[in-house]
Curated annotation (Swiss-Prot):
The gene is cobS. The lineage of its organism: Bacteria, Bacillati, Bacillota, Clostridia, Eubacteriales. It comes from Clostridium acetobutylicum (strain ATCC 824 / DSM 792 / JCM 1419 / IAM 19013 / LMG 5710 / NBRC 13948 / NRRL B-527 / VKM B-1787 / 2291 / W). Belongs to the CobS family. InterPro entries: CobS. It is found in: Cell membrane. This is Adenosylcobinamide-GDP ribazoletransferase. Joins adenosylcobinamide-GDP and alpha-ribazole to generate adenosylcobalamin (Ado-cobalamin). Also synthesizes adenosylcobalamin 5'-phosphate from adenosylcobinamide-GDP and alpha-ribazole 5'-phosphate. One of its GO terms (biological process) is cobalamin biosynthetic process.
Length: 252
């Protein structure tokens, strides 16, 4: 079935989880499959949540938090962090659009990339350690779900910025508002099923932040790329943690 073929495609492409499965894949499958990435986020988050529960039996919760974040990088291969770095190198170079796109494709790592990646990782760690441990497992499970929603929003609300082909083109060209609707439904079902306190409020903000982020990036370069989809994913996760902290803090 197309559903399982596309889900496996996303697991293979976006994670290091070893799944040996081969089938005929089209460029359209990549864009259509993007609707299913909240499920991929749930798989990643589920692994992280179980790992955290085991780690806190041995280590202090702050050590457990940093180890879980390292596990996240390992599970994803840093693919979205790479996109974050490339995006910041290009967008904040203060160059014309075409030069920005060239910088984003350059394999060399610039100062903006290093600062962006380090800042996001530190922010994620600091916020996690400030969250009430009673909520930690649920917060961790939903962390990659909120992030991957950002990729769907970004792809469905933008056009491809480069001339010619690129990996991001398949996602952006074929991820339509239909995929966005499916993705948001899956995202909402997962969010509410996990049962995080005030989850119905918290789940709205990653949608809004993703829209704001993609509008900003597309205004800078006239569209989006695969790197930008990854950048929005990572930034969305950090803004999600900020939202969780704020909502739980003011809840008292």
């Amino acid at each position: 079935m197309a559903f399982f073929r596309r889900l496996i495609l996303m697991i293979q492409f976006l994670t290091r989880i070893p799944i040996k499965y081969e089938s005929d894949i089209t460029t359209e499958d990549f864009g259509k499959a993007l609707a299913l990435v909240p499920i991929v986020g749930l798989i990643i988050g589920g692994i992280m949540g179980v790992t955290y529960m085991l780690l806190v039996k041995v280590f202090f919760y702050k050590i457990s938090a940093v180890l879980v974040l390292i596990e996240y990088i390992f599970l994803t291969g840093g693919i979205h962090l790479d996109g974050l770095g490339d995006t910041f190198d290009g967008v904040f170079s203060n160059r014309p659009k075409e030069r920005i796109l060239e910088i984003m494709r350059d394999s060399r790592v610039g100062t903006n990339a290093v600062l962006a990646v380090i800042s996001v990782i530190i922010l994620n760690y600091v916020i996690l350690t400030e969250i009430d441990p009673a909520y930690m497992v649920k917060v961790i499970i939903l962390f990659p779900v909120a992030g991957r929603l950002g990729s769907i929003v970004s792809a469905s609300l933008s056009t491809y910025a480069r001339r010619g082909e690129g990996m991001g083109k398949s996602f952006i060209d074929y991820c339509t508002l239909k995929e966005l609707a499916i993705g948001i439904i899956l995202y909402a079902v997962i969010f509410l099923s996990v049962g995080l306190s005030r989850g119905y409020i918290i789940m709205i903000f990653p949608i809004l932040t993703a829209v704001i982020l993609i509008k900003y990036f597309t205004r800078k370069i006239g569209g989006a790329t695969g790197d930008i989809l990854g950048a929005v994913c990572e930034l969305n996760q950090t803004f999600y943690l900020m939202t969780v902290y704020a909502v739980l803090y003011f809840r008292g």
